[in-house]
């Protein structure tokens, strides 16, 4: 039985077990990930994040082909042990973990490329947290019908890919949002081959205040269940709401989640429109746990 040195971290309540494995020698099994994330018998988290040098794993070497400066790879695993392409909250916490453990230097205002399964993502440190360029996004997956427990009827969703798949559903009121039971997996028809995260969204009234759009959302994350926050989900929800609102909709958004607020902005680049995410990150405590 080996010991694992870990750090518990969170971003707007989306929490993670992080550990450094520069040489790529600690390949957790699905069962070990599940045990670490168990909130009753383990540490408790929405997922695990391994900090591994990009040169030491195949996915990292692919990231280096995209950007030779992407020295570190974020190996994210969901509660069930399945790998995730990207985590918008996790990458902010991951970057803070690298800084606090002396693995990188990143003064405020500077940017660092991080390897992920969705490709390289640029992270900038700010005075109050981190901003992440999530890259290009696209409408993907059509408009599947979504059935969630305690919602009276099936609703049309909008498929959006921001490096990982999402289906966003608009609801009419915060009361309706509160009634949905996301402890159960929402049913999608048709079901995406790789599954999807599902966001339930309520636009604010008024929608836009001082040029910023406002929405409230909850999320069921594929492989993890309902979480207090999902960064890529917040981006997908803002993109979907802008799509529904039409050409006059803003490109700056404030997304309120159970765990706190995140900022989303859309901006043009040479290779098309990108979406950015901003929010806080915190390292909560360090510890050592025995791996079964």
Curated annotation (Swiss-Prot):
Major subcellular site: cytoplasm
Organism domain of life: Bacteria
GO MF entry, a single one: diaminopimelate epimerase activity
Annotated site residue numbers, Could be important to modulate the pK values of the two catalytic cysteine residues: 166, 221
Example of a GO biological process term: lysine biosynthetic process via diaminopimelate
Any one Pfam family match given in the protein's UniProt record, by short name: DAP_epimerase
NCBIfam families reported in the protein's UniProt record: DapF
Stated name of the protein: Diaminopimelate epimerase
Organism of this sequence: Clavibacter michiganensis subsp. michiganensis (strain NCPPB 382)
């Amino acid at each position: 039985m080996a010991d694992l040195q870990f750090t518990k971290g969170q971003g707007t309540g989306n929490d993670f077990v992080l550990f450094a494995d520069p040489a790529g020698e600690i390949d957790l099994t699905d069962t070990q990930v599940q045990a670490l994330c168990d909130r009753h018998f383990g540490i408790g988290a929405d997922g695990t994040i391994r900090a591994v040098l990009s040169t030491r794993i195949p996915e990292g070497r692919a990231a280096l082909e995209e950007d030779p400066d992407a020295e570190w790879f974020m190996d994210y695993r969901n509660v069930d042990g399945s790998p995730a392409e990207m985590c918008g909250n996790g990458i902010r916490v991951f970057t803070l973990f690298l800084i606090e453990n002396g693995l990188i230097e990143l003064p405020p205002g500077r940017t660092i490329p991080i390897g992920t399964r969705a490709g390289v993502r640029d992270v900038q440190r700010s005075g109050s947290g981190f901003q992440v360029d999530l890259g290009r996004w696209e409408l993907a997956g059509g408009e599947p019908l979504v059935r969630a427990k305690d919602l009276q009827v099936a609703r049309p969703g909008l498929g959006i890919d921001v490096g990982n798949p999402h289906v966003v559903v608009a609801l009419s009121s915060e009361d309706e949002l509160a009634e949905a039971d996301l402890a159960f997996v929402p049913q999608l028809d048709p079901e995406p081959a790789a599954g999807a995260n599902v966001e339930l969204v309520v636009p604010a009234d008024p929608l836009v205040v001082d040029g910023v759009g406002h929405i409230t959302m909850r999320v069921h994350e594929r492989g993890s269940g309902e979480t207090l926050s999902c960064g890529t989900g917040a981006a997908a929800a803002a993109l979907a709401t802008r799509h529904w609102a039409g050409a006059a909709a803003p490109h700056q958004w404030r997304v309120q989640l159970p765990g706190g607020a995140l900022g989303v902005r859309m901006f043009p680049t040479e290779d098309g429109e990108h979406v950015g995410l901003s929010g806080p990150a915190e390292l909560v405590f360090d510890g050592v746990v025995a791996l079964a």
